[in-house]
Design a protein with these regions (language model features):
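Histidine-acidic metal/acid-base catalytic patches
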Residues: 2-46, 53, 57-72, 77-92, ...
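Active-site acidic/histidine proton-transfer and metal-coordination neighborhood
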Residues: 22-35, 60-63, 128-234, 244
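Catalytic domains of carbohydrate-active enzymes, especially glycoside hydrolases
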Residues: 87-106
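Glycine-rich, proline-tolerant flexible connector loops at the mouths of alpha/beta enzymes
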Residues: 103-113, 126
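Short hydrophobic/aromatic-enriched beta-strand-loop microsegments
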Residues: 117-125
Length: 321
């Protein structure tokens, strides 16, 4: 398991423009109910067939066009399918506004395409603020990320509690508060948010779960944020991880409305596409975000199990409420 977002999957050979356009054509036929589309033409499934036909007729309307949810693509999930410039093209094509967690060296490419990085990397998730031994390295990386975001006008920097390493939860929380207080004043000065991500510790599959991660419950992370006591200290509300560890996703969105600074998506189980092969019903969750007045970004962070452009088209459409 990587301890840093700088360790990204290797990229395949870049796609040609023709192949990218071919993928676009394929994605235009994707329906809002995922794998059902693969069965839709079946004569013994007339309801699905009708839905699929309607989706194909209205394919041009399936991008993010309503403007209520500002959508982003999380770079590490799709880096092996497209090079960075191509991924930016995909984001624009889908109506997304950001490609996030990318290497800052690629940020000029974001600007070229009129995109932002909704949230930036800092330190890794294994060695975090719950252990004072790592405060210095975390602080240095967070400072550097804040500076980069301030220069480009990007809003958020990611941060993590770190793994338990036999540290009691109450001690880990106190250490986090102490560590974040060392950097939050700088974030305030630079007008950049620091977003603490809650991760699941139940799934023992690389990048689908993080056994040993201390900040594995929403309320635990929110309590740390409250004790830091800054409007620049926020929660990265990852719907996939919250569903696995806590459930009650909409209730938690409403309860923690004042603290949510960024949102991630994925289907559960499997951190897969947002389709009918997983259990999370995304449209009402997106509507709940709109209802609480959330104006931040929603990052699509699933690991494709099929054509990535078709899966992204479907996910972006489903979240466009």
């Amino acid at each position: 398991m990587s301890d840093s977002f700088s360790s990204l999957p290797d990229r395949d050979e870049p796609l040609s423009r023709r192949r990218l356009l071919e993928g676009t054509a394929l994605a235009a036929g994707a329906v809002a109910w995922g794998a059902t589309a693969n069965r839709a033409a079946s004569a013994d499934d007339p309801v699905a067939a009708k839905r699929n036909a309607a989706a194909k007729r209205n394919a041009a309307d399936k991008a993010a066009t309503k403007g209520n949810i500002h959508q982003s693509l999380v770079e590490w999930c799709y880096a092996k399918h497209w090079n960075f410039d191509e991924l930016c093209q995909v984001a624009k094509q889908l109506g997304c506004e950001s490609v996030e967690l990318a290497d800052p060296k690629d940020w000029p490419t974001l600007k070229k395409h009129g995109l932002v990085s909704a949230i930036a990397r800092s330190h890794g998730f294994e060695k975090g603020m719950n252990n004072p031994d790592y405060h210095e390295i975390c602080t240095d990386k967070i400072h550097a990320a804040i500076d980069a975001c301030a220069e480009y006008g990007f809003p958020n920097v990611i941060t993590f509690t770190g793994f338990r390493e036999d540290i009691p939860d109450d001690v880990g929380a106190k250490n986090c508060v102490d560590g974040f207080k060392k950097v939050i004043g700088y974030a305030e000065k630079k007008k950049v948010n620091l977003c603490l991500e809650m991760l699941n510790s139940r799934v023992d599959i690389e990048m689908k779960g993080h056994p040993g991660y201390q900040g594995d419950h929403t309320d635990y992370c929110v309590e740390i944020i409250k004790q830091v006591g800054s409007p620049r200290m926020k929660l990265l509300f990852d719907i996939y991880h919250v569903q696995i560890m806590d459930g009650d996703v909409i209730t938690r969105i409403r309860r923690h409305a004042d603290y949510i600074g960024h949102v991630h998506t994925a289907g559960n189980p499997g951190r897969r596409e947002l389709d009918d092969q997983q259990e999370i019903n995304y449209p009402p969750i997106m509507r709940a975000l709109v209802e609480i007045g959330y104006t931040g970004y929603v990052g699509q962070e699933f690991i494709p199990t099929r054509d990535p452009l078709a899966g992204l088209t479907q996910a972006v459409a489903w979240c466009d409420v």
